[in-house]
UniProtKB/Swiss-Prot annotation:
Subcellular location field: Cytoplasm
Keyword flag Lipoprotein: no
Broad enzyme group: transferase
Any one annotated GO CC term: cytoplasm
PANTHER family: HOMOSERINE O-SUCCINYLTRANSFERASE
GO molecular function terms attached to this record: homoserine O-acetyltransferase activity; homoserine O-succinyltransferase activity
Name of the protein described by the UniProt record: Homoserine O-succinyltransferase
Chain's gene name: metAS
Amino acid sequence: MPVRIPDNLPAAGILESENIFVMSETRAANQDIRPMRVLILNLMPNKIETETQLLRLLGNTPLQVGVDLLRIHDKESKHTSVDHMNTFYRDFEDIRNNNYDGLIITGAPLGQIDFKDVVYWDHIREIIDWSQQHVTSVLFLCWAAHAGLYHLYDLHRQLLANKRSGVFNHRRTSDPHPLLRGFDDEFFAPHSRFAEMDIEQIRQHPDLEVLAESDEAGAYIVLSRDNHNVFVMGHPEYQKDTLNEEYVRDVGEGLNPDIPQNYYRQDDPTQDTIVRWHSHGSLLVSNWLNYYVYQLTPYDLSDMNAKTPWESKK
């Protein structure tokens, strides 16, 4: 089934060229189907690139998905035009009374800044709090995963001596679980961050469960025991060249970055990159959307209330 996107969104042409099924709002409005409503809070600098990456994953699921793009209103984007933001993005005040099937909160290049020093931290906290009552399931990615664990569970991250960048091997750490259905025992995923959460601190928290981890990269997938919040410490949405583009950028800025691990052939930046995470990244988002959103969300979103669908089934 297609991902349903606003008419004329730039990502549409890219996705169609990759044979990913997308549908305009105009065409979808003529179908008698209740699409999943997913809100994306896009905190990444290059909005269009991140939109495309996430829509690519959502478009590979068997469900029709309608997407709203959300911005932090008083945070002007330096890398995306004002026209694009005003045309395709909504402010929180516009949607605060809405309910959604799912919410995705992206990463952000804020890994070395204390959460309380982030200029829009109060807005992030407000949206996270709102999501606990107005969204069936929330998917936090990379920086957002750290932010969510800090705000909701008072877990603190530790800064790394060097940026952790690369593609790392992970293993499942739980019994068969819907979020990992179809996963191999071991799989790869990209990471790009300056901090990490102490995996033992997560394990000891009574409201959290570690589903996948890496010897090199630590905790990867963490689930709240009420199944409402999914925290992914890496970037399953990254495309083939994303880590390379970040590396080249950092070299150009004189930051002397480490070469992304397990990414270039023979660990040589002059050679091609090796993609070995796309299938599991796609499966992760598909499982989340199916088992944690579609199977649990009310048909009429106005029926959503303070009790989550998971609690209603107890």
